[in-house]
């Protein structure tokens, strides 16, 4: 196998963050134009961003909001869930996915994941459906679409809504169709570490005009005309500054996603040859956008996951654990009686996963440096 020798530029210690927002002169100019206009909210930038994003993913409606959590919250509010209703969510995700179910007075029901992709397992979803189930929230984790064909079949059989948590999958595709267009509603985040960012921000996508109208009302105080409010709503509007940044970032998204895929392919090439490390698995149907590049540290790798992360940190390589425990084991959920939930694949994954830098600022020498530091402990 190829050996990544620590010599020349590769030998020099590097500082490589796990994520790096890429903002430049175009974003600065877009912000300057907004500031000079004097219109910081409810101007043309948000509307233009919504139209551009809807066109990019391929839906009739896109609604810009303050962040990805709010996107999920408003999507669920639009469904008008009742107390005691159940929503099936993955046990392996960022906690906002299930928290937003609790915000409605509904109950998140945790389903296990597929070992290879870390996405929600349709077979376990099917087992968890009850008479109280009203919706599913598949998460397109780390940038790979979930098995939406099977999940939509389950939803159709049981007359359930499907809300896509697309917070990590900007531009990802399932059989050529972009995430955020596959269910009843799609929810995106533009947090600073995402494939495209507005600092904070979110977007809700749908082809359902009735749901879109309800979401727009909820976003803006339930207001249909100035000082006329038909429902109880909120102030969840995106600012003009955020939208201006988003418009610039959206234009760069495909190119940057392609750089992520190229970096991932180079990482795959090295990691596949290191005994005890398993690279990400990509489904045949998927156009993965690698929000995170997540490996599994197996039992036969010389270092346990935490020790490997510590070693990489010492060498300047940023890593992260997405995620260290199932949501149902978080203290806030234990108090709600979820401590008896069992999702064995999730629990095993939580002790093995490790995210490595894959963002567009990572270059060829960075990848060689990562490989050399992974290989140094391997007998391969």
Residue ranges and their predicted role:
Residues 77-166, 173:
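PLP-dependent aminotransferase-like
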Residues 63, 88, 109, 162-163, ...:
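Structural detector of well-ordered beta-strand residues that form the stable sheet scaffold
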Residues 164-197, 225-230:
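Conserved active-site segment immediately N-terminal to the catalytic lysine
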Residues 2-39, 44, 315, 357:
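N-terminal "arm"/small-domain region of PLP-dependent enzymes with the aminotransferase-like
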Residues 189, 202-207, 247:
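Short beta-strand-to-turn element immediately C-terminal to the catalytic PLP-Schiff-base lysine
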Residues 7-11, 47-51, 59-62, 123, ...:
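PLP-dependent aminotransferase class I/II
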Residues 39-86, 100-104, 110-112, 177:
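Phosphate-binding glycine-rich loop
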